[in-house]
Amino acid sequence: GVFAGRVGIPRLLDLFDRYGIKTTWFSCGHSIETFPEQMKDVVARGHEIGLHGYSHENPLAMTPEQEEKILLHTIDLVTELSGKKPVGYRAPWWEFSKVTNDLLVKHGIKYDSSLMHDEFHPYFVTTGDKWYPIRYDQDPDTWMKPMEFGKETDLVEVPCSWYLDDLPPQMFIKSSPNSFGWVSPDVIFELWKNQFDFLYEEGEGVFPITIHPDVSGRPQGILMHRKLIEYMRSKPGVTFVTYAEACEDFLSKK
């Protein structure tokens, strides 16, 4: 929304500058064109721009032709904005269609961050996965079958998680019955800190937090992020990187 562009983006940029952190902004084409000065500032301050559809349209609701046209258009928008072709993508609604993976590979996208087959460790996306939905109108023998995993592709997945997303618990949306908006940032801090502590104890991995300018750009969000960043920075060996850097680190070890 307008608050995100006018207020949330500048606040988050100042937050990241405060700690010298470079981040990845998966930005809708609509936002790039509606708030050009703010988005130019994101690039000027050294952050990565990733793809995120045009108007947050759901890939599952589109034809392959529509999905590809939007992908190509937003690639052009990000390239014009940042001066280089984007290498990362996050699907609106975190939804992959049957052709999303193939389209990303076809058009040179190196990594995605929309899937949740792991929490903290990148992996290669598979295409052609098949599972059998329950069909009460059919003989159970037709659907009592295990999931069949498809072929591994060259697309790297830097996973995301609903449990590391600021929006579901902290953004009120009138038309969405499961939105909240009044969950205390202290609760979110404890949830995220506990997950971080588990990963830190387990060993190496990525900690992929998803935040939004219209949520974390609120005063209570900024203060919580300061606290979380300072806590994570206090742990030896912790570094903050962009998603592109996480992807390259994963590939360098293969």
Write out the residue ranges for each language-model feature:
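Acidic-and-aromatic substrate-binding clefts and catalytic sites of carbohydrate-active enzymes
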Residues: 2-6, 24-36, 57-68, 90-98, ...
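Active-site beta->alpha N-cap acidic-glycine motif
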Residues: 1-48, 230-232
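Conserved, mostly hydrophobic/aromatic
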Residues: 16, 49-52, 89, 104, ...
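Hydrophobic beta-strand scaffold residues
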Residues: 23, 49, 111, 239-240
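Active-site-adjacent pocket scaffolds in enzyme catalytic domains
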Residues: 79, 84-202
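Active-site beta-loop-alpha junctions enriched in small/polar residues
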Residues: 28-30, 54-56, 91-94, 116, ...
